[in-house]
C-alpha cells in the first residue's frame, strides 16, 4: 500500500476575516472528500486570514495511482472559482 501526500499553500486575496477563510477552507475540504475520497486537513497558517495550508492524502495499492488521485485533487482545487490561488505545492509518495 502506498500513500501520496500533498501540502498546498493557498492565498485567499479576497478574504477579509478568519470566518470567511474558514468557510472557504471547509468548502474545499468537503468537495475534495466527496469527489476524490481523500483526507484533507488544515495544517498551517491557522491565524492568518489570507493564507491557508492544506494537506491532502490518498491511499492506494500503487504509488502511481495514489499520486494520480492527489494530482487530480490539486487540479480540481485550481479549477474552483473560490478566489483561491495555489502559491506552493509539494507532493510526496510514501511506499
Where are these regions (language model features)?
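Short, charge-patterned binding micro-sites
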Residues: 3, 41-62, 93-95
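Short glycine-/aliphatic-rich beta-strand segments at the starts of folded cytosolic domains
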Residues: 4-12, 18
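Structural beta->alpha junctions
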Residues: 12-16, 59-62
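C-terminal binding/interaction regions
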Residues: 21
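Short catalytic helix/loop segments, enriched in acidic residues and glycine
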Residues: 29
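Cys/His-coordinated zinc-finger cores
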Residues: 32
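Short beta-strand elements
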Residues: 36-43, 85-90
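C-terminal structural segments of small proteins and small subunits
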Residues: 59-95
Amino acid at each position: 500500500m502506498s500513500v501520496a501526500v500533498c501540502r498546498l499553500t493557498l492565498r485567499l486575496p479576497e478574504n477579509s476575516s478568519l470566518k470567511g477563510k474558514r468557510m472557504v477552507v471547509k468548502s474545499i475540504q468537503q468537495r475534495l472528500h466527496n469527489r476524490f475520497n481523500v483526507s484533507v486537513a488544515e495544517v498551517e497558517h491557522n491565524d492568518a486570514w489570507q493564507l491557508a495550508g492544506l494537506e491532502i492524502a490518498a491511499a492506494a495499492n500503487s504509488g502511481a495511482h495514489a499520486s494520480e488521485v492527489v494530482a487530480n485533487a490539486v487540479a480540481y482545487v485550481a479549477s474552483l472559482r473560490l478566489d483561491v490561488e495555489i502559491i506552493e505545492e509539494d507532493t510526496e509518495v510514501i511506499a
